[in-house]
Curated annotation (Swiss-Prot):
Organism field: Streptococcus equi subsp. equi (strain 4047)
Segments for region (Disordered): 117-149
Protein name (record): Large ribosomal subunit protein uL3
Pfam families the UniProt entry points to: Ribosomal_L3
A single cellular component GO annotation: cytosolic large ribosomal subunit
Gene that this polypeptide is encoded by: rplC
The organism's taxonomic lineage, starting at the top: Bacteria, Bacillati, Bacillota, Bacilli, Lactobacillales
Keywords: Ribonucleoprotein, Ribosomal protein, RNA-binding, rRNA-binding
SUPFAM superfamilies listed in its UniProt record: Translation proteins (SSF50447)
Length: 208
């Protein structure tokens, strides 16, 4: 059965194991998620649970949103997401970090840091031209394509907005779970800036 929870990226730190191994970890704070809705094939056409994370002030919510969370007897939420293949939960139930344990393998999804408008070297890793000896080609994108189509093909690597994309990193290991602090320590780095929304789910392609 799939397990999943929403959390907030706190930052990175490092821990040492009992054997003295040094492990860089990302700290994810995941306060209890509340099940807001249970979707079924009969009513919605598919099966999933809808969870809310991070309370927000009622003055910032409209009446439909207040009515929706009232069914779960909870406060309005900043983030609402869905998880599939999760069973046995009812509206109003809480999902806490102790559903995971050290050694679990998970997929982590977040929004990558926005870098603004960048050129092809930073954005796509292209090589630059000579920087001296009369060269007039330094950090430009280069050829736009052959003459015969007389146009630029779609998906040509050019300058543009970089970052701010939905990114998933697969098969990351959970190093430690601290239930009393609602904290999960994940080995390595995860996408996103500090205080950004992070989704943690059971790994889809984990080695069996």
């Amino acid at each position: 059965m799939t397990k999943g929870i929403l959390g907030e990226k706190v930052g990175m730190t490092q821990i040492f194991t009992e054997s003295g191994e040094f492990i860089p970890v990302t700290v994810i704070e995941a306060t209890p998620n509340v099940v807001l809705q249970v979707k079924t094939v009969e009513t919605d056409g598919y099966e999933a649970i809808q969870v809310g994370f991070d309370d927000k002030r009622e003055v910032l919510s409209n009446k439909p949103a207040k009515g929706h969370v009232a069914k779960a007897n909870t406060a309005p939420k900043r983030f609402i997401r869905e998880f599939k293949n999760i069973e046995g939960l009812e509206v109003g139930a809480e999902i806490t970090v102790d559903i995971f344990a050290a050694g679990d393998v998970v997929d982590v999804t977040g929004t990558s840091k926005g870098k603004g408008f960048q050129g092809v070297i930073k954005r796509h890793g292209q090589s630059r031209g000579p920087m001296a000896h009369g060269s007039r080609y330094h950090r430009r994108p280069g050829s736009m394509g052959p003459v015969s189509p007389n146009r630029v093909f779609k998906n040509k690597h050019l300058a543009g907005r970089m970052g701010g994309n939905r990114v998933t990193i697969q098969n990351l290991e959970i190093v430690q779970v601290i239930p009393e602090k609602n904290v999960i320590l994940i080995k390595g780095n995860v996408p996103g800036a500090k205080k950004s929304l992070i989704t943690i789910k059971s790994a889809v392609k984990a080695a069996k």
